[in-house]
Amino acid sequence: MARYIGPKCKLSRREGTDLFLKSARRSLDSKCKLDSKPGQHGRTSGARTSDYGLQLREKQKLKRMYGVLEKQFRKYFVEAERRRGNTGETLIQLLESRLDNVVYRMGFGSTRAEARQLVSHRAIELNGHTADIASMLVKAGDVISIREKAKKQGRIRESLDLAASIGLPQWVEVDASKMTGTFKSAPDRADVARDVNESMVVELYSR
């Protein structure tokens, strides 16, 4: 399955929640009507969604939120299942530990897509070495920095200013003046993806 490159608001409207695919520079309400699905007739009434349909929607929601395709998403699920602890919570922690997501959480990119582009354009260093694989998993204590030649990019400074005004998550520590940050730990489940029911994703893959 190819990566979706169409309107981002359409995906958020389809899932009925903000997938954080757009920059927070403007309120999402001014861009997307989340209470209506995309299409000519919008949300239909009276039709009950099956359990399978609900489970599939939750999986699609997670995949779209983190910008991950099916093959890679399944790999994360298999790894989450292999590890100790709650499979659904571990799955979300793995997604949160992706390099592109951590770059986004640190405020270097205003969206995950923008953060992924910074990684693919070799603007990011991980522990002092250039990192250009968005799916790399970051570990507690890892240091992420903007490469020297990329520090003049205006969009990075704008994103950092925006992140500072909104507030950074507690599991990252960022020195905006040096454009460097530390991944302190994987986030607690209660702090991320609050509109996702990951247990339905586990049920879907367990069918």
Swiss-Prot record:
Annotated family: Belongs to the universal ribosomal protein uS4 family.
GO CC annotations, alphabetized: small ribosomal subunit
Name used for this protein in its record: Small ribosomal subunit protein uS4
One Gene Ontology MF term: rRNA binding
Lineage: Bacteria, Pseudomonadati, Pseudomonadota, Betaproteobacteria, Burkholderiales
Functional summary from the UniProt entry: One of the primary rRNA binding proteins, it binds directly to 16S rRNA where it nucleates assembly of the body of the 30S subunit. With S5 and S12 plays an important role in translational accuracy.
Gene: rpsD
Keyword Ribosomal protein among record annotations: yes
Keyword list, A-Z: Ribonucleoprotein, Ribosomal protein, RNA-binding, rRNA-binding
